[in-house]
Amino acid sequence: MAELTPMMKQYLEIKEQNKDSILFFRLGDFYEMFGSDARTASRELDLTLTTRDKDKNKSFDEKVPMCGIPYHSSEGYIARLIAKGYKVAICEQTEDPATAKGLVKRDIIRVVTPGTVLDDTSLEAGRSNFCAAAWLAEDKAGFAACDISTGQTHATAFSGPDAGVHLLNEVARFSPAEIILNDTAAQDAALRMLTENKLSCHREIREIDGPAARASIAGQFGEKALSDFPADNFAPLLALGNLLHYLHETQKGDLHHIDTLDFYRQGQFMELDISARRNLELTETLRGKEKKGSLLWVLDKTKTAMGARMLRSWLERPLLSVRDIDRRADCVERLVNDTVTREELALALSGIGDMERLMSRIVYGSAGGRDVVALRAALEKLPPIKRLLTVFPKGRLQELCRTLDTLDDLAGRIAATLQDEPPFSVREGEFIRDGFHPEVDRLRGILHGGKGLMASMEAQEKEKTGIRTLKIGYNKVFGYYIEVSNSFKDQVPDTYIRKQTLVNGERYITQELKNLESDILTAADRVSALEYELFTDLRTELAGQVSRIQASASAVAELDSLCSLASVAVSNGYCRPTVDDSGVLEIHDGRHPVVEKMRPDALFVPNDTYMGEKEGRAAIITGPNMAGKSTYMRQVALIVLLAQIGSFVPAKSARLGVVDRIFTRIGASDDLSAGQSTFMVEMTEVSDILHAATKDSLLILDEIGRGTSTFDGMSIARAVLEYCADPKKLGAKTLFATHYHELTDMEHSLPGVQNYNIAVRARGEEIIFLRKIVPGGADRSYGIEVARLAGLPEGVIARAKTILRELESEAGKPPAPIQEEADQVSLSSLAETEVLSRLRREQVDTLSPLEALNLLYELKQKLQ
């Protein structure tokens, strides 16, 4: 190391401590990268790769690769690296290079990871960005998650043989960007597949002991927080301790905005497994992974990013307490009934900045002048909101009114200190308001009026000395000087100090002139430094008020979410459901909340639902494909879920007993990554449901057994339904869609089972789906008619009819083979049927004469 230059030695020492990160090494106005980091950054960021001569750098085998980026535009580059899964260690100059003696001191100020980003370019406004931790040990599991961009921190515990399954569901619900795992959790196959393949989150494997974990938690949240953790389960304490230790290690600073811990217990919220979240399309669609088309898309009419995040969390954590559900629904109902206040609140909430994330940047010291001014703009909107809330005399809305601190003092402090439109960088100056600080005003006067000040001094000196030809000038050698011609040099005062003799005169300086010169030449640096000092004082003061500001931000988020639910209820014609512990699901004229919004021009057919603890506990639903069986079942599940987040529901009326869990088995697909076939995936999911469900669960089962032979599939479907419906075994409320019509006889053999079908009207060879759920089993599946709607050739349709008749008449005797002659005929008739099918599909009235002629020619060619 002795042969290295001091700067490269410093670089390598810092890099050695951050081997797993790309090191952004501050050199002047740039962040430079060297060696392998430079190669990686050049490739990932499309940067030009240059080299640094070897000189004394014998630690490198050849010229040192290097590349760099301007420090003031680093956020975008960091965001791109983080999105690609890298970590970035930011190494700053920790002293002023102008005053440094020798090598400038540098140190890591922060390590940016996927779970710890703070800048807006890397964050989705309406979605939390969690860094999580999971701890697994035999039959105990702990989970913790923190969004450092808002300060929200959660933790929970699971015990028993299914602890690992519950942990898996919790990780899926939070969908963290990064997760810290102990060795046992890291080796868990299901957890590895979820985090690596499905969530694509960054994994860190770390261990921590009990005393260190307790110290981290007590230091962050206080000793009292330790009492929340169960005495018989150490896993959540170790998970949270591991997470906090990692956050302190990467953030290198105070995390005092993370001051509130939400420790929740199993049973507070409805647990939804990965399959249910996916199949019900709560936050994104199955196919496109888009928000549009999801339940969140329908519900999210929030005006703030804080409200959007809270509403999303409500949707992902339905409540189980009737009291808590009613408490939230009461707020929604009051807002529904008070149109004027609701609309005024929506207007007042509009444009409020993301107070939570602004405060995180302020606490970390990364906030600029524009961030602080954005906070001020948000704070100034709080008083009108508080005034509007005073119309609610009681309940949670009144509590929000009391909680909402208008923070007038902080808004006033910011307004007095900062300009309304500060520059992008606080290093540019000109962001402290005129009149706030006398010295700033004086230095600005000097900076902007330097020429005027010199002209004023020149006039004063002329008057004082009586020298008419006296003038003040400037050159790079002497700076400012007073020049007097030879004819007046005898009148020069003793206070003038001669600096230069000219042919026609003399040049002098005075102490007063040198003082003014110093002010003018250093004013820019001095005012910039003073403004930055005043700004950091303000930022520190605001950081000290983080608890007050975050409390008001939380109140705004909750109010915004409630207003959103109320707005949706009014615009979509929802009703308030009665939620109780009766175990009954009774829905009149229920509608699918998403389907009716995706197809606003089509008339949505509402349907009734009744499922009691005894009568109608299980419903067998038969009918053709495309008729709406899956839509109806999802509709029931979504109405239940909406009710349990405190929302109104798309129905004329509803009475809903609280459901502890919703399970879904819908659709079929291979899981190639796990080496499982479609049928194996289906059976695994059914097995998980039967083991985890209780009598208070709602089961949505679609086409169980279709992935194997007919008799095997029918046997499995019947056995599963018997198990679900039998109160001596499971007795859960079950919606069971099937094409096995033989199962409909279970209505007579198993109490609590009822048959329903989707009404269909046949018109000749055509069918019309009425979308209405009616009692009784379907008498046929209309599969051939659906095939015709899908556009299968008429020759295939005709052959299918023949086979069906033979199967129905001979009770399973194999259909007679098609004769060779028939084959030959069918080949020609197939062309004819394709032509007929094409003609049926064409909208002839919309064709131009030329298009019609081309179509005719094409069809004739096909027949020939």
Predicted regions located by residue number:
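Conserved phosphate-binding elements of NTP-dependent enzyme cores
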Residues: 1-2, 9-13, 20, 539, ...
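Charged catalytic and DNA/RNA-contacting regions of genome-maintenance
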Residues: 1-334, 350, 354-363, 367-459, ...
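ATPase nucleotide-binding head domains, primarily ABC-like/P-loop NTPase cores
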Residues: 35-38, 233, 303-304, 311-314, ...
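Extended active-site and interfacial segments that coordinate phosphate-rich ligands
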Residues: 38-55, 146-174, 490-521, 601-611, ...
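Conserved catalytic alpha/beta cores of large enzymes that bind or transform nucleotide phosphates
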Residues: 171, 176-183, 190, 512-545, ...
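Amphipathic heptad-repeat alpha-helical coiled-coil/stalk segments that mediate oligomerization
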Residues: 208-220, 270-274, 286, 377-456, ...
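Intracellular alpha-helical coupling/juxtamembrane segments of multi-pass membrane proteins
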Residues: 325-328, 348, 352, 450, ...
